[in-house]
């Protein structure tokens, strides 16, 4: 039986590819997509969800827009990474359907209440919507199987020296999620920086030849430009968000450890840092399954295999 999931995302090139991977995988049942503000403004990320689902011919999936700003802070966006639209690069279709007349949290609540089994939440942007859900509906925690997030790291940041972007945008929300007592699975920079897509991989995807694979290749053409800067030391582009979906599909591709994680919300230099108690120094019980390594080639092969599914539909 397919695993029911809700995807809360802020597309964003890698969010869009995570969405593609989820919908190419019969092991997963995508019950709803909610948008968060992060990689671009809330209106643009919501529109990008609708554009991608239009491309994928999945306008049957309910969509709702989420919080317009973090819980306690002004919104920061990553337009320097994802461009003016948030999905610069390919010529995506205009949306052919509209979002639900409700908020992201209201849609999540509806899905959770109607589900016969616990639902996995996958959050690939800032954690604002998920935190609002957890705080406002404690009675539904039992309907959440786990929360799989892309965010954080063990010490290295990509937005500040200490903080990864998604957590930095709304650290208060992330702290609520990590301390919720629910099972948390974290795909942080430690693993996503090892999930680099190389130029040869992009050409492999392009050669698949169907419109979805071509769009993914064109998304990556744009996404790779930002990551060519010498400061990163990358050979390709780290494909952060699809690691969450890949873990659900093939956890054997990943090395994980269970550790306690907290989020720094006030540090002068460390706001948004995920503090990972790797050596169990605090005595705190582990609250997070932390991805620390990946079979990169297996990850690329999975993406290529699933992109090819769109050729036979």
Curated annotation (Swiss-Prot):
GO biological process, one term: nucleobase-containing small molecule interconversion
Enzyme Commission code(s) on record: 3.2.-.-
PROSITE patterns recorded: IUNH (PS01247)
Active site residues according to the UniProt entry: 240
GO CC annotation, single: cytosol
A GO MF label: uridine nucleosidase activity
Keywords from the named record: Glycosidase, Hydrolase
Keyword Hydrolase included in the entry's annotation: yes
Cited InterPro entries: I/U_nuclsd_hydro_CS, Inosine/uridine_hydrolase_dom, IUNH, Pyrim_hydro_RihA, Ribo_hydro-like
SUPFAM superfamilies: Nucleoside hydrolase
Family: Belongs to the IUNH family. RihA subfamily.
HAMAP family: Pyrim_hydro_RihA
Protein role: Hydrolyzes cytidine or uridine to ribose and cytosine or uracil, respectively.
PANTHER family hit by this protein: INOSINE-URIDINE PREFERRING NUCLEOSIDE HYDROLASE, URIDINE NUCLEOSIDASE
UniProt name for this protein: Pyrimidine-specific ribonucleoside hydrolase RihA
Species, as recorded: Enterobacter sp. (strain 638)
UniProt gene name: rihA
């Amino acid at each position: 039986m397919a695993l029911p999931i809700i995807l809360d995302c802020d597309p964003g090139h890698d969010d869009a590819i995570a969405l593609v991977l989820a919908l190419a995988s019969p092991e997963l049942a995508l019950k709803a997509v909610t948008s968060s503000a992060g990689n671009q403004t809330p209106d643009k990320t919501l529109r990008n969800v609708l554009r991608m689902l239009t491309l994928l011919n999945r306008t049957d999936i309910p969509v709702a827009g989420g919080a317009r700003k973090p819980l306690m802070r002004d919104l920061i966006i990553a337009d320097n990474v994802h461009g003016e639209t948030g999905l610069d690069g390919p010529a995506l279709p205009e949306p052919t359907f509209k979002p639900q007349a409700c908020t992201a949290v209201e849609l999540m609540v509806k899905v959770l209440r109607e589900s016969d089994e616990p639902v996995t939440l996958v959050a690939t942007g800032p954690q604002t919507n998920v935190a609002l859900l957890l705080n406002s509906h404690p009675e539904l925690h039992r309907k959440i199987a786990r929360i799989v997030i892309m965010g954080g790291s063990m010490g290295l940041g990509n937005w500040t020296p200490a903080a990864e972007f998604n957590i930095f945008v709304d650290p208060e929300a992330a702290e609520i999620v990590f301390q919720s007592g629910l099972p948390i699975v974290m795909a942080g920079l430690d693993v996503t920086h090892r999930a680099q897509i190389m130029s040869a991989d992009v050409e492999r995807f392009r050669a698949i030849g169907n419109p979805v694979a071509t769009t993914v290749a064109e998304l990556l053409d744009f996404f790779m430009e930002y990551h060519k800067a010498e400061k990163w030391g990358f050979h390709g582009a780290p494909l952060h968000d699809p690691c969450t979906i890949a873990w659900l599909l093939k956890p054997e591709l990943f090395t994980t450890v269970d550790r306690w994680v907290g989020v720094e919300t006030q540090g002068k230099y460390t706001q948004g840092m995920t503090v990972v108690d790797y050596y169990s120094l605090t005595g705190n019980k582990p609250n997070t399954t932390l991805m620390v390594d990946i079979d990169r080639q297996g990850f690329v092969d999975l993406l290529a295999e699933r992109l090819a599914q769109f050729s036979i539909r």
